[in-house]
């Protein structure tokens, strides 16, 4: 969208009064081209891809559609859980290379799931996971105990999330204060065989620390978001053992 806006004529750009924004970045240089725009509405929750200060200076209102893609992301995360725990991508590639053999994965039933963040997506995901007979833990700086109790979710410390969970799911909103919040300190606490999933924002997770921990220990990761997107073809994340990667598609469904 941003690329198209920059390529259009000045007259056409000036005729635009509202923008429905996706994942593209709307920085000051882009906003300066949109003199007629009065509002940018983010199709999703996070608005970290929009320069809010520049928007304010330009008199542009920024809002978001909270919860609109919660189900899409929740379902995708469940897909990543099974893809990793049952080694579905690895088995597919093995067959493509002529290898027929068993891959002994793990079942989800009875596992402990840790949600790092319990907002709209976390609550939807907890509801979807409740049918799998799992134990649900959550960490949130503003815990909603009433909703959590009804969903069978127990709030614990972030340290307990990483030490106790078989599957850890990062669901925090991004802010500059939370860059690399999921650091080596927490990643090194993961239990043997644990899986961490990030479908929130790439910059929440210290990717270098993740690579180090995966190299040293038997832990797994499934990543839909990255600190820099699109992910470079030479990125070690693409070639590291025990990591599944997808190109930021968790929210991308026809319905959402």
Question: Model segments located where?
Answer:
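Glycine-rich NAD(P)-binding loop of Rossmann-like domains
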Residues: 91-124, 133
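Conserved acidic E/D residue at the C-terminus of a beta-strand in Rossmann-like folds
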Residues: 140
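C-terminal helix-to-coil terminal segments
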Residues: 56, 63-76, 229-256
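Rossmann-like adenosine-cofactor binding region
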Residues: 27-28, 143-236
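N-terminal glycine-/charge-rich "phosphate-binding" loop or analogous flexible N-terminal tail
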Residues: 1-18
């Amino acid at each position: 969208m941003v690329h198209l806006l920059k390529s259009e004529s000045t007259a056409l750009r000036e005729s635009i009064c509202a923008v429905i924004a996706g994942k593209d970045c709307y920085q000051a240089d882009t906003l300066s081209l949109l003199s007629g725009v009065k509002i940018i509405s983010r199709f999703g929750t996070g608005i970290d891809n929009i320069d809010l200060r520049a928007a304010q200076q330009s008199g542009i209102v920024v809002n978001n559609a909270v919860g609109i893609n919660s189900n899409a992301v929740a379902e995708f995360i469940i897909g990543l859980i099974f893809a990793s725990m049952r080694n579905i991508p690895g088995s597919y590639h093995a067959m493509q290379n002529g290898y027929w053999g068993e891959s002994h994965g793990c079942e989800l039933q009875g596992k402990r799931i840790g949600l790092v963040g319990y907002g709209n997506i976390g609550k939807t995901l907890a509801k979807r996971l409740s049918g799998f007979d799992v134990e649900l833990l959550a960490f949130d700086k503003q815990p909603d105990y009433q909703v959590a109790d009804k969903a069978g979710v127990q709030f614990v410390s972030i340290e307990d999330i990483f030490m106790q969970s078989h599957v850890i799911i990062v669901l925090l909103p991004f802010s500059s204060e939370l860059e690399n919040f999921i650091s080596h300190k927490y990643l090194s606490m993961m239990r043997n065989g644990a899986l961490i999933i990030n479908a929130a924002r790439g910059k929440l997770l210290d990717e270098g620390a993740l690579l180090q921990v995966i190299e040293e220990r038997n832990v797994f990761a499934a990543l839909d978001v990255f600190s820099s997107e699109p992910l470079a073809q030479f990125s070690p994340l693409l070639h590291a053992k025990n990591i599944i990667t997808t190109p930021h598609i968790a929210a991308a469904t026809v319905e959402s």
